[in-house]
Amino acid sequence: MNYLVMISFALLLMKGVESVRDAYIAKPENCVYHCAGNEGCNKLCTDNGAESGYCQWGGRYGNACWCIKLPDDVPIRVPGKCHR
C-alpha cells in the first residue's frame, strides 16, 4: 500500500500541478485591459492560456476583460494603483 502512495506522489510531482483562477487579466503595470465587446477579451484570454474570457461591463475597474481559468503565471489585477 505504501508503494502505491509513493508511486502516486511521484507521478504527481513529475506531471506538475497547474493552478488556475478567474480574474481580470492585467498589463505588467497592474492595469486592466479595457474592452467594448467579448470577442477581443476571449482572444486575449485564450491566447494567454485561459479557458475563455469576456468583457465585464460596469465592473470594479470599468469595462475590463475577465478571464476564466487563467494560469497562475499570467498577471492579474491586484489591489493597488495602476502604474501607467
From Swiss-Prot:
Limits of the LCN-type CS-alpha/beta domain: 21-83
Q: Does the keyword Disulfide bond apply?
A: yes
Give one Pfam hit by family name.
Answer: Toxin_3
- Report the GO molecular function annotations: sodium channel inhibitor activity; toxin activity
S-S bridge residues? C31-C82, C35-C55, C41-C65, C45-C67
Q: Where in the cell is it found?
A: Secreted
Main location (coarse class): secreted
Question: What does the entry list under GO cellular component?
Answer: extracellular region
- Prosequence residues removed at maturation: 84
The question of whether Disulfide bond is a record keyword is answered with: yes
Summary of the tissues where the protein is detected: Expressed by the venom gland.
| Signal peptide annotation | 1-19
UniProt keywords, alphabetically: Disulfide bond, Ion channel impairing toxin, Neurotoxin, Secreted, Signal, Toxin, Voltage-gated sodium channel impairing toxin
Supply one GO BP term. Answer: defense response
- Could you name the domain of life of the organism this protein comes from? Eukaryota
The UniProt similarity line reads:
Belongs to the long (4 C-C) scorpion toxin superfamily. Sodium channel inhibitor family. Alpha subfamily.
Function field: Alpha toxins bind voltage-independently at site-3 of sodium channels (Nav) and inhibit the inactivation of the activated channels, thereby blocking neuronal transmission. This toxin is active against mammals.
About its domains, the entry says: Has the structural arrangement of an alpha-helix connected to antiparallel beta-sheets by disulfide bonds (CS-alpha/beta).
Q: What is this protein called?
A: Toxin BmKaTx13
- The organism named in the record is Olivierus martensii (Manchurian scorpion)
Q: What is the lineage of its organism?
A: Eukaryota, Metazoa, Ecdysozoa, Arthropoda, Chelicerata
